A protein has these predicted regions:
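A general sequence property marking short-to-moderate contiguous segments
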Residues: 4-25, 45-123
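An N-terminally focused, membrane-permeabilizing/fusogenic/translocator signature enriched
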Residues: 23-33, 37-42
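Ser/Thr-rich low-complexity repeats and stalk/linker segments
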Residues: 126-131, 136-205
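Short loop/turn and low-complexity linker motifs enriched in small/turn-promoting residues
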Residues: 30-36, 48-52, 125
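Short beta-strand micro-motifs in enzyme catalytic cores
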Residues: 43-47, 131-133
Length: 207
């Protein structure tokens, strides 16, 4: 079918990174950019793509990129056939504290820049990681604070965080992430190895 042939995640991601709008064929196929994050200092990026509701074949996936030399190169990509509802963003005041920051997905791939720098000496212990995590946050959250970086949350509440981690044999932990309101209040936090954010954890301890 035409809408199936017109979707190439890597090419769509590269258009987003270059600041260009999606091609007509991408829009015709119902493809939308759910969220994106570029850490220019680390030279990594992640683009979250989906297909609008109503299409018979769902698209929901992330492409990771790393700057190698003067160009962006795809590190990894993947996704599911699950539909992603872009409407009905929850409010933590109505839905409860667990909806303030909900983990959706994550992924990581070996650094292409490190791989090229090593040449024939392909030792995984010397290769860093390019990683991402996706979340849906409540309506009370305006942005995520990741170190010195501020990542604005789109209106639908889905947001993605990209980072680069140093070499290790295992997938890297995330950087500390805080969900922040419009007035600068830290609503909840998620540490490098946490399975639950601080607000959800506090609500469980209080029960």
């Amino acid at each position: 079918m035409a809408y199936a042939r017109s979707y190439d995640p890597e090419s769509v991601g590269l258009r987003v990174l270059s600041g260009r709008p999606l091609r007509w064929r991408h829009r015709l196929a119902g493809i939308v950019v759910v969220a994106s994050d570029i850490d220019a200092d680390a030279g990594v990026a992640a683009i979250w793509l989906a297909r609008r509701a109503g299409w018979p074949i769902a698209v929901n996936g992330v492409c990771q990129f790393e700057r190698v030399g003067n160009s962006w190169q795809c590190v990894s990509g993947g996704g599911t056939g699950e539909k992603l509802p872009l409407a009905g963003r929850p409010s933590a005041s109505r839905s409860g504290p667990a909806s303030m920051m909900t983990h959706v997905s994550s992924g990581a791939g070996r650094s292409r820049a490190d791989r090229e720098a090593l040449g024939l000496q392909q030792d995984p212990a010397k290769m860093g990681w390019v990683a991402y995590e996706t979340f849906r946050v409540a309506a009370e959250v305006a942005h995520l604070q990741v170190g010195a970086r501020r990542i604005k949350v789109p209106q639908h509440g889905y947001v993605i965080v990209a980072w680069k981690a140093p070499p290790s044999y295992v997938s890297p932990p995330r950087p500390p992430i805080a969900a922040v309101s419009d007035d600068g209040l830290r609503l909840t936090e998620l540490g490098p190895n946490d399975h639950l954010d601080s607000l959800t954890w506090a609500s469980l301890q209080g029960d």
